[in-house]
Regions:
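Short, flexible turn/loop "capping" segments at secondary-structure junctions
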Residues: 46, 102-104
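Catalytic Tyr-x(3-8)-Lys segment
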Residues: 52-53, 106-110
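Crotonase-fold acyl-CoA enzyme core
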Residues: 1-81, 116, 120, 130
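C-terminal long alpha-helix characteristic of the crotonase
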Residues: 1-3, 54-101, 117, 133-157
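Helix-loop "lid/cap" segments that line or gate small-molecule binding pockets
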Residues: 36-37, 89-93, 108-114
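Generic hydrophobic alpha-helical segments
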Residues: 33, 71, 86, 109-110, ...
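An acidic, glycine-rich surface segment that forms the CoA-thioester-binding/catalytic face
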Residues: 11, 18-22, 27, 104, ...
């Protein structure tokens, strides 16, 4: 609630760094990114929420409990491998300019996860109205195709060889 966020680089005589010019437009759109990055204005928590830089605002005293509750919900309800692949896709798709290729990656990941034990467990748990018991782990059960550097965001010759 008392957080403040700003990309103040231009107010210090330098350009935005840490991939701000790449990340911020993807989060808030080009018009808002331009406003934020070219003015260097500092936003309060409510403004950051309105701009889409944060997903929610909580009172300062509730920040750690809210973060833990979100982490617990993900850990309790979501299949770990599915979460890991989703995170990989969220970041990877941001670099992908070819919509048809992105759709292929999406379909491949959906098909693969749908054939795994956690998919069967997720459906079973839902039908039986009980918490899921996930058996797969990101440390040991990730699909091999995620290691292919040509999969998302690659450019040039490596991409053409698909």
């Amino acid at each position: 609630e008392s957080a403040r966020i700003g990309f103040v680089f231009v107010r210090r005589g330098v350009v935005p760094e840490a991939l701000s010019t790449w990340t911020v437009p993807r989060l808030v759109g080009m018009a808002r990114a331009g406003e934020l990055l070219m003015t260097g204005r500092i936003l309060n928590a409510r403004e950051a929420l309105e701009f889409g830089l944060v997903s929610r605002v909580v009172p300062d005293a509730e920040l750690l409990p809210a973060a833990r509750a979100l982490a617990a919900e993900i850990a309790r309800e979501a299949a770990p491998v599915s979460v890991a692949i989703t995170k990989w896709m969220l970041w990877g798709m941001q670099m992908e300019s070819d919509l048809a290729h992105a759709d292929d990656v999406d379909a491949r990941a959906f098909w693969w996860t749908g054939t795994q034990p956690d998919a069967r467990e997720g459906v079973r748990a839902f039908l039986e109205k009980r918490p899921p018991r996930w058996s797969m782990r990101p440390s040991t059960d990730m699909p091999d195709f995620l290691r292919d550097p040509r999969l998302l965001g690659s450019r040039g010759e490596a991409r053409k060889k698909r």
